[in-house]
């Protein structure tokens, strides 16, 4: 009995894995919903991380509150990376989610997954994962275009991005993503206040 309790407390139980899987699926759906207005348009696509960050806060924070263990957020980041790569996104988008998922997990762990402020910061960092593809776009547009052409993106779409993608957009994208993530997280805590109090989430 003691060994079972230790495993459940330290590692992820089957229930934790199922919970993580369910919330990852929801996170993926809301990421798509948040970005669907921006992604199809080569001029607005740079703002897709902002739209996605605006919707996923409550989902992320509720998952953290229900599991409250290391690796859950990491798994979310890895699964998001795999799914997005399979869907034809640039490899840097997937890598961004994986890396920021690990970092977000470590940050949330600093507050034992129970600190409201730390969890919000954790979510903000995770959302930066969605900017990975665009970072490569600005750093190496030629290589980015070659990869996306191989993934099936139309040349006209890429040309429009390169014509309209001024460097100042990168600043707006990063700052906007952080701001949208913070707003989404605060709204999530307001909407689900009772659930978070029950889970022992503190200020």
Where would I find each of the regions flagged by the language model?
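Hydrophobic alpha-helical transmembrane segments
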Residues: 17-22, 50-54, 74-78, 94-95, ...
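Hydrophobic transmembrane alpha-helices
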Residues: 2-71
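Short helix-perturbing small/polar motifs within transmembrane alpha-helices
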Residues: 29, 97-135, 185
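Membrane-embedded alpha-helical hairpins and interfacial helices in multi-pass inner-membrane proteins
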Residues: 45, 120-193
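Membrane-interfacial segments
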Residues: 34-42, 67, 71, 91, ...
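Alpha-helical membrane segments and adjacent membrane-interface helices in multi-pass membrane proteins
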Residues: 46-106
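Short, charged juxtamembrane terminal tails flanking transmembrane helices
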Residues: 1-7, 192-203
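Aromatic-anchored segments of alpha-helical transmembrane domains
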Residues: 24-32, 79-87, 125-135
């Amino acid at each position: 009995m003691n060994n079972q309790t230790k495993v459940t407390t330290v590692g992820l139980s089957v229930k934790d894995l199922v919970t993580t899987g369910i919330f990852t699926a929801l996170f993926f759906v809301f990421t798509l919903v948040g970005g669907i207005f921006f992604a199809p348009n080569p001029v607005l696509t740079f703002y897709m991380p902002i739209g996605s960050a605006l919707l996923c806060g409550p989902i992320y924070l509720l998952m953290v509150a229900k599991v409250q263990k290391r690796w859950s957020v990491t798994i979310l980041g890895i699964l998001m990376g795999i799914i997005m790569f399979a869907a034809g996104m640039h490899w840097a988008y997937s890598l961004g989610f994986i890396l920021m998922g690990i970092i977000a997990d470590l940050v949330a762990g600093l507050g034992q997954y129970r600190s409201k402020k730390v969890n919000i910061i954790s979510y903000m960092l995770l959302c930066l994962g969605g900017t990975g593809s665009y970072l490569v776009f600005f750093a190496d547009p030629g290589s980015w275009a070659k990869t996306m052409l191989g993934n099936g993106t139309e040349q006209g779409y890429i040309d429009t991005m390169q014509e309209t993608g001024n460097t100042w957009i990168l600043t707006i994208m990063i700052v906007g993503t952080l701001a949208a993530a913070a707003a989404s997280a605060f709204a999530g805590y307001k909407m689900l206040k009772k659930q978070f109090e029950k889970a022992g989430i503190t200020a």
